[in-house]
Amino acid sequence: MELRVLAVGDVVGEGGLQCLEQHLRSLKKLYRIDFCVVNGENASGTGLTPKQADRMLDAGADILTLGNHSFDRREICAYLDDCPYILRPANLLPSLPGRGFGTFETKIGPVGIVNLLGRCNLDFRPDNPFRVIDKVLKELDGLPVLLDFHAEATSEKLAMAYYLDGKISAQWGTHTHVQTADEQILPKGTGYLTDLGMTGPVHSVIGVKPEQSIANFRGELTSRYEPAAGPCMLAGAVFTIDAQSRHLSLIHISEPTRQAEIS
């Protein structure tokens, strides 16, 4: 028996959210998906509201993961404690709302899902993810584990993947909003993709209005970034896990769709 997991890249803005609502169920049917994990931390541009979380779960996501914008929308804080299907990075302070990993029932039995935040080139430094994952894996002992590593640096993501090779079933990256083409199965059986990409506006600079990004690089930006308008795409990857080996047997990059549009 095998488990087919669809991991969807960062949902950006209302356009990305509508794209997810319009296409997720058909993609799940097309790829015969058993379990779906969606990174939702940019649904508000930066951050996530309870209403947006509910919309993504209603659209077909089983689990939502977050990242460095986990608490940008204060109204999500209480919701993180109440909803077991949303994970914020496990290497944030334990006193903060929510949880960073969990065990979830699937057709092959319980599976561990973990959310971690990288430390390179980010505005703040969470606890060391390499040390935190050691503690998490002890609690998830014996289970297939899937990791969303929300990080900026490719080197940090690759180092984590080789550190966990043979210890978890798969690791995918989020945060950069650019899908990579380096899908691979590492020597000891762990599946890896540096970044899933984003679910959001095509004609944008990683999801935001190009003119705002240009102004920023010219040293002229005076307003907050806003998600771009126009056609959107959904990006992610399908991971197929064999129940006996509990390691990845196949990676397939899901085909983007550009039919959703928000103006």
PLM feature spans:
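Single conserved hydrophobic/aromatic residue that forms the stacking wall/gate
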Residues: 251-263
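Conserved beta-sheet core of the metallophosphoesterase superfamily
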Residues: 35, 55-66, 78-89, 154-227
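Glycine/small-residue-rich loop that forms an oxyanion/phosphate-binding "nest" at active or ligand-binding sites
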Residues: 70-106, 113, 123
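Active-site-proximal beta-strand elements of phosphoester/diester hydrolases
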Residues: 3-9, 110-118, 146-148, 193
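Active-site-proximal segments of metal-dependent phosphoesterases and phosphodiesterases across multiple
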Residues: 40-56, 118-127, 135-176
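Divalent metal-coordination and catalytic microenvironments
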Residues: 10, 64, 114, 146, ...
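N-terminal active-site segment of His-dependent metallophosphoesterases
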Residues: 1-54, 100, 127-128, 135-138
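Binuclear metal-dependent hydrolase catalytic cores centered on His/Asp/Glu-rich metal-binding motifs
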Residues: 26-27, 97-144
